[in-house]
Amino acid sequence: MSGAAAGEKPVGVRRYSEDMTQPQGALLVGSVNYDDAETTIRTAADLLGTRLRRIPDGEVGKRFHWIMFQPDVIGRAEGIERIGEEPIPFPAGIDARGLRIGEGVDAASIELPPLGYAAAAIESYAVFTRLQAEGAVPAGVRFQVSLPTPLAVISSFFHGDDRAAIEPVYTSAIVRELDRILAAIPHEDLAVQWDVASEMGIIERAAGYGSVMEAWWPGDPFDGLVSRLAVLVDAVPADVEVGVHLCYGDAGEKHFFEPRDAGNLVRYANAVVAASDRPLTWLHLPVPIDHDDEAYFAPLADLAPVGELYLGLVHREDGAEGAARRIAAAAPFAPEFGVATECGIGRAPAGSTEGILRTHAEVAAAW
């Protein structure tokens, strides 16, 4: 399985100097450091315009800290308990305590409440359509909804045997969120991105956030990671765009693992592409700020074709100049790509967001 979906134009790269290629198109990975969806959507459309094929709402509110709000939601379910007597304060009024299945509780009997993703998407889509009707968002641009893989939430907040027990329960809950979104938003307006971070931690056996990140199923962990993500990709209907954002974490702008090259990113992406029944509309791969070396990008030569490839090589610390160095290093191995940050912009310092967006515009051509 390869190639762009029907009617899609592959990402191109245009010459913008004698010795450098210019990427075409930009992707906003998800979170954007603005207070509300309208500001995010307006600003993104204004600064990036036709470089964007889809615009997210910025993951505002409790989603600002990615999945950290999920324990407060899941913890309301009968049969789920919080670990520890006292709340662990976290920004946005979040309680960061972990979760466990109550003693003697059959996990299959647990009924999780709505997780909050569908409600947020439906609310923000109303803003998006209003702005598009006003002409603030170009016609044809889709509304992007980012969802975490179930593995991220399970591996972050559950422990031991509870992980295997709760996995089918939480997976069903996230698929219900997706189905609500699919029922409420016209498919021709929708793009769904799966945020894939903990999976890379398991592949790399990362310990950057404390303990080693490990799988909880029998057999080769890699095979289980591939099959789980392929199921999620295929849960998105063919008339809805689907993307995958691979990530090495972004807690305080720090990774849980520092990759030497893109080899495991390419290996995982290729396996998921091969295992999925439908094509990926886009694939996003992170590029750490320290890597403007060709060795990091060399594995991209073996990447299976996808509709659009975005390299997360834009960093606030070195702007367009640093992005240009990384573009030059990537070009011999990935002749067609657009640009993005390596993770969401949400955790960037306040006041830096506009500059980051402008960097995208400086280094990427419009469609």
Residue ranges of predicted features:
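Well-ordered, non-membrane alpha-helical segments in soluble/globular domains
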Residues: 37-38, 115-131, 166-177, 215-232, ...
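Aromatic-lined glycan-binding groove of carbohydrate-active enzymes
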Residues: 226-306
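N-terminal basic, low-complexity leaders that serve as flexible interaction/assembly modules and, when applicable
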Residues: 13-90
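Acidic (Asp/Glu)-rich catalytic clusters
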Residues: 128-140, 182-187, 231-239, 272-278, ...
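N-terminal amphipathic/basic-hydrophobic helices that include classical n-h-c signal peptides
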Residues: 1-19
